[in-house]
UniProtKB/Swiss-Prot annotation:
UniProt function note: Overproduction of CaiE stimulates the activity of CaiB and CaiD.
GO MF annotation, one: transferase activity
InterPro entries for this protein: CaiE, Hexapep, Transf_Hexapept/Carb_Anhydrase, Trimer_LpxA-like_sf
SUPFAM superfamilies: Trimeric LpxA-like enzymes
Region (Disordered): 179-198
Listed PANTHER family: DYNACTIN SUBUNIT P25, GAMMA CARBONIC ANHYDRASE-LIKE 1, MITOCHONDRIAL-RELATED
Family assignment from sequence similarity: Belongs to the transferase hexapeptide repeat family.
Gene3D superfamilies linked to this entry: Hexapeptide repeat proteins (2.160.10.10)
Stated name of the protein: Carnitine operon protein CaiE
GO BP term, example: carnitine metabolic process
Length: 198
């Protein structure tokens, strides 16, 4: 892992969290219990404070940053998809930010909301609970259904379990030169399926 103190502030990582060795945490970063931080994530706490609350995840290639005197927060069980950028915003409890989405300064994503992949949430947006946000700029399409929230929670549970699995089952290695016979397949811990397969 790459951890850097910045002007005396050292990242804080709960012992039950998993931070991938290629992720970078700088300065005023606080990571809660059971959090998963994926490969190549960059958390730059060199201006504002960055907080990932318990059970949340920040997947590979994500960026967190914010201005001075602001907190960028992912609340409990928040789910941040691959390549998303969070800048000076707040993501509510049990909300999902889809892959390659951007959430700008002062924006608030309401609890149990879903931001669709590739969406751009403008600075200052003030969301409410269980909104489905879509587009660039993002607009409220409708309320999140119970089925969608269940799907989101299964995905978040996969990442909470992945934090545990990675602490015990991830190790650096050298590649094989050919595929072994009867190569096994990995399995998740829930019955979650891609939305296209539902």
């Amino acid at each position: 892992m790459s951890y850097y103190a910045f002007e005396g502030l050292i990242p804080v990582v709960h012992p039950d969290a998993f931070v991938h060795p290629s992720a970078v945490l700088i300065g005023d970063v606080i990571v809660g219990a059971g959090v998963y931080i994926g490969p190549l994530a960059s958390l730059r706490g060199d201006y504002g404070r960055l907080i990932l609350e318990a059970g949340s995840n920040l997947q590979y290639g994500c960026i967190m940053h914010g201005y001075c005197d602001t907190d960028t927060i992912v609340h409990e069980n928040g789910h941040i998809g691959h390549g998303a950028i969070l800048h000076g915003c707040v993501v509510g409890r049990d909300a999902l930010v889809g892959m390659n989405s951007v959430i700008m300064d002062g924006a608030v994503i309401g609890e149990e909301s879903i931001v669709a992949a590739m969406s751009f949430v403008k600075a200052g947006f003030q969301g409410e609970a269980r909104q489905l946000l879509v587009g660039s700029p993002a607009r409220v399409l409708r309320q999140v259904t119970d089925q969608e929230l269940h799907w989101k929670r299964l995905n978040t549970k996969e990442y909470q379990d992945l934090a545990i699995r990675c602490r015990t089952g991830l190790s650096e290695t050298k590649p094989l030169t050919q595929v072994e016979e009867n190569r096994p397949r990995l399995k998740g811990t829930t019955d979650v399926k891609p939305k296209s397969a539902q």
